Amino acid sequence: MAIQKGDFIKLSYTGRFEDGRVFDTTDEELAKTEEIFNPRGLYGGDVVIVGAGHTIDGLDEDLEGKEVGYTGTVVISPEKAFGPSNPKLVETVSITKLQDRNVHPGLPVEIDGKRGVVSRVIGRRVTVDFNSPLAGKTVNYEYTIEKLLETETEKIQGLLALYTGIREIEIETADGVAKIYIPTGLTFNQRWLMAKNRVATELFKYADFKEIQLIEKITAESEAQELAELTAEAEAEESSEPEI
């Protein structure tokens, strides 16, 4: 069955620049080899909803009409990747604004809270590009559609993993109602606080739920773990305080 908008799929991919450099991948070993490994990242494939904006436009569009098991490569222009480079974000400043005076093209810098990369040095003047490193780049994605998710539980857990980085969260579903038991540690997680409304909205739109219940689950075990973590943090802070 061909993939269409609204489908929940598991997707493995590797994104490369035109020169072959990898900037993103779901392959943990490749990420380590290319020195882009993120210890907080979730590897092994992402669950995305086709057409929901979970990937860049060019990749999202290419998924439609493919079959589960499909492996291929798509070349994506900046307009449908990470956007064109904005010339207004390229500024020329005095070298005195930089802490590091050993300035050269390619040097990452931060000026007035903005991060950029030095693109040119002429005398005492430095041109800094504050665009995203991905802006204006043609990229290619090599990807595999591993699975079409069909059960309610798979869809919810996949979406939660995408937004929280946690694969296993307890879920119950019945009669159009989803009960999601939120672990204590996630309750005050900034990433989760910003994402939970979007999770609910997408489950209403793409999975036909009529009610989402977010239930904070506290157990003796989780409380003990939380206490142990807080105690360890407090001891670490104490040990780092200078003696008077």
Report the location of each language-model feature:
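FKBP-type peptidyl-prolyl cis-trans isomerases
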Residues: 1-244
